[in-house]
Swiss-Prot record:
Pfam families: EFG_C, GTP_EFTU, GTP_EFTU_D2, LepA_C. Its EC number is 3.6.5.n1. GO terms for molecular function: GTP binding; GTPase activity; guanosine tetraphosphate binding; ribosome binding; translation elongation factor activity. It catalyses: GTP + H2O = GDP + phosphate + H(+). It is an enzyme of class 3 (hydrolase). The gene is lepA. Disulfide bonds: none annotated. This is Elongation factor 4.
């Protein structure tokens, strides 16, 4: 028995990090009786430990709620809780495409932030109806009226029907449920009689059931025992279970048009279930697939190596398991003279990189070292071909390269105007080009074009420290453009260290090189001979530091006597040191690499 689609509401919650959207989801589940009170815990939908600790949502989660409205009808509300962070924007886009409306949650004490804007525009692009919800109105610093004005000015949507709530205490949450039923539309299209057409919203790996696929039915009926086909990959599967999340997994007989639920079909890998793909029935396929999603492209690359070489196989297995669950993460093997065997990994952004590294260390008990993050450069070769460069150590000979292009981003920064000067300075320092500046009350919104290379290092940390944590930042990839980029190598005792080489803009090369040499000088222990540490571009040395040699006091046993006796001993020592320097190898401890790489970020 399928549900009349007029009584279905599919919606997502759009908000900036920390504006309380997972807490609001908890309250909605509690008030509609989705879980018993004893089963409730904070952030029910954030199932990973790391999500709960950092207070962020990474994987989009879904839940089906039954709500008896004031008009006496019972509605089915399908909530998709989306991530708020810029790196996981692809999770947001696929979740939004499965819904018809969104709750826009804004913190009444902080107002509109950069990521609120990015996600709202995505919702508007998907032609969503929006219900404005002002959260945290019980805080002493809350200014709901000012924030309403700000929403109207910045986003340009009507806030006369905005709902004021406190998700923590539950105040105003029943009004949100009423607003969902009243203001959001039911699914627009869908016919039970049409051939099966289902949108694949998300998928994740379960040790017992294989891949669990989150789906939104558009046409037809999805039931157990059907043979389905993925239109993107052409692979066929037999549906074994059909169900919904309440947020517990509950099996149902069928899913009809407009409904959101899950299926399992003994699928082995998440990579087989491409998000945004269309699922249809093998026996009676639909004519055309849904307008497809782009598979997520990695933006930031870095090398990940085990500190203990014996952990290499464990790392390979762990990465394979994470890949099961995260199709946007890619990796391939690489070797480094300094760090041994490891992997070159691609990520959606810096937070994604940090989270994958932390999950590898935490869930699989591995000790890892990550090289400095780099972006994908395009090399225009003299023979007319174009090569992509993921690792600065693989840079071809500059004689063969006619030009190098680097990726640029369009960054939006929202900040209280007190910190504006320092933030503009930071953007200029990072080769930024200002595109726009506007004021909303006491907050400024700045738009800059920035090279991604300058952002992946420590831009976010610097921005937060300059603005004492008040500025928020969001970016979209724009395009590649040519830059005066050079490969900077670090030489220790005349030998190049591949793990520390990086591509930098010529104007900042000297500064970066000097700071790297100074750090290494403190980190590499003294040897019996002096060690030069140099930063070089091609054959030109741009910075140098020297680690002094350890030396024994050879003249200690001379009491008085002729000065030539002392000189002879000192000359002999000098001769030995010189020979040592020719044949001696510099031992660079692993800890020095780890520290240098940490700092170079």
């Amino acid at each position: 028995m399928t549900v009349d689609r007029n009584y279905i509401r599919n919606f997502s919650i759009v908000a900036h990090i920390d504006h309380g959207k997972s807490t609001l989801a908890d309250r909605l589940i509690q008030m509609t009786g989705g879980l018993e009170t004893r089963e409730m815990k904070e952030q029910v939908l954030d199932s990973m430990d790391i999500e709960r600790e950092r207070g962020i949502t990474i994987k989009a989660q879904t839940v089906r709620l039954h709500y008896k409205a004031k008009n006496g009808e019972t509605y089915i509300l399908n909530l998709i809780d989306t991530p708020g962070h810029v790196d996981f924007a692809y999770e947001v886009s696929r979740s939004l495409a499965a819904c018809e409306g969104s709750l826009l949650v804004v913190d009444a004490s902080q107002g509109v932030e950069a990521q609120t804007l990015a996600n709202v525009y995505q919702a508007i692009d998907n032609s969503h109806e929006l219900v404005v919800v002002l959260n945290k109105v019980d805080l002493p610093a809350a200014e709901p009226e000012r924030v309403k004005e700000q929403i109207e000015d910045v986003i340009g949507i009507d806030t006369s029907e905005a709902v004021e709530i406190s998700a923590k205490t539950g105040f105003g949450v029943p009004d949100v449920l009423e607003a969902i039923v009243r203001q959001l539309p039911p699914p627009h299209i869908g016919d039970v009689k049409n051939p099966l057409k289902v949108m694949l919203v998300d998928s994740w790996y379960d040790a017992y059931l294989g891949v669990i696929v989150l789906v939104r039915v558009i046409d037809g009926i999805l039931k157990k025992g059907q043979i389905i086909r993925m239109m993107g990959t052409g692979v066929k599967y037999l549906v074994e279970r059909v169900g919904v999340f309440t947020p517990k997994m509950v099996q149902v007989d069928t899913l009809g048009p407009g409904e959101i639920g899950f299926i399992t079909a003994s699928i082995k890998e998440v990579a087989d279930t491409r998000v945004g793909d269309t699922i249809t029935e093998e026996r009676r396929p639909c004519e055309n697939a849904l307008p497809g999603f782009k598979p997520a492209q990695p933006v930031v690359f870095c090398g990940i190596f085990p500190i203990d070489a014996a952990d290499f196989d464990g790392l390979r297995a762990a990465m394979g398991k994470l890949r099961l669950n995260d199709a946007s993460f890619s990796f391939e093997m690489e070797t480094s003279a300094a760090l041994g065997f490891g992997f070159r990994c691609g990520f959606l952004g810096l937070l994604h990189l940090e989270i994958i590294q932390e999950r590898l260390e935490r869930e699989f008990n591995l000790d890892l070292i990550a090289t400095a993050p780099s972006v994908v450069y395009r090399m225009n070769m003299n023979n007319g071909s174009v090569k992509e460069l993921h690792n600065p150590a693989d840079m071809p000979d500059l004689v063969k390269v006619s030009s190098i292009e680097e990726p640029w981003i369009r960054a939006t920064i929202m900040t209280p105007d007190d910190y504006l000067g320092a933030i503009l300075e930071l953007c200029q320092e990072r080769r930024g080009i200002q595109v726009g500046l506007s004021y909303v009350g006491t907050r400024a919104m700045v738009t800059y074009n920035l090279p991604l290379n300058e952002v992946v290092f420590d831009f976010y940390d610097r921005l937060k420290s300059i603005s004492k944590g008040y500025a928020s930042f969001d970016y979209q990839m724009t395009d590649y453009s040519e830059g005066d980029l050079v490969k900077m190598s670090i030489l220790v005792n005349g030998e190049s260290i591949d793990a520390l080489s990086m591509l930098v803009h010529r104007t900042v090369a000297e500064k970066r090189g000097r700071s790297m040499c100074e750090k290494l000088k403190d980190l590499i222990p003294q040897h019996m001979f002096q060690i030069p540490i140099q930063a070089a571009i091609g054959g030109k040395i741009i910075a140098r530091e020297t680690i002094r040699a350890l030396r024994k006091d050879v003249t200690a046993k001379c009491y008085g006597g002729d000065v030539t006796r002392k000189r002879k001993l000192l000359e002999k020592q000098k001769e030995g040191k010189k020979r040592m320097r020719q044949f001696g190898k510099v031992e660079i401890p692993q800890s020095a690499f780890i520290e240098a790489l940490k700092m170079s970020k």
